[in-house]
Amino acid sequence: MKRPLEMAHDFLAEVVTQDDIVVDATMGNGHDTLFLAKLAKQVYAFDIQEQALEKTQERLNQAGLKNAQLILQGHETLDQFVTEAKAGIFNLGYLPSADKSVITQPQTTIEALEKLCSLLVKGGRIAIMIYYGHEGGDLERDAVLDFVSQLNQQEYTAAIYRTLNQVNNPPFLVMIEKLERYRHG
């Protein structure tokens, strides 16, 4: 059985091509940025911590990839850089090996999700990894689930992939796809 993050990558890899623009809304250590840079024409990656940009740039340099723009800003500013996207990924929580008090916040995450949903091309996808074992994580989890469950079913489909028998608040995946065409009825 695949872990949620593996499923997230597979979910995006099914639709992303070398012609596409994609977003890594939470750069972190750069694993998702690197993954997306191998698939897409251009990656826009966001983080508010300088350490994240440094680690990600190092990872991209080692792979010889130059198709990622690393942006030291919150993901809620993504619409200042991106006009349309085929895919996006969020890893909510905190940057491992960094200050664990610096966490993603419900209001900016929802703002970023709203913007990315509107910028998604038809057939585009968003993968949201929700880590919620830290203080404040449950509030963000609930805000994201509330937002996603209210997306118009004529325009989007959404699903959750999670383990049921794991302890200690295991992370889970929320998947959103913008439908190719509106459904009726």
Regions found by a protein language model. Give the residues of each.
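Conserved SAM-binding motif I beta-strand of class I
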Residues: 42-47
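Conserved beta-strand signature within the Rossmann-like core of class I S-adenosyl-L-methionine
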Residues: 119, 123-130
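Helix-to-beta-strand junctions that scaffold the AdoMet/dcAdoMet cofactor pocket
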Residues: 17, 65, 120-122
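Class I S-adenosyl-L-methionine
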Residues: 137-185
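Mobile active-site "lid"/loop adjacent to the S-adenosyl-L-methionine
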Residues: 93-111
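S-adenosyl-L-methionine
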Residues: 1-21, 54-84
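Conserved SAM-binding loop of SAM-dependent methyltransferases across substrates and taxa
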Residues: 29-40
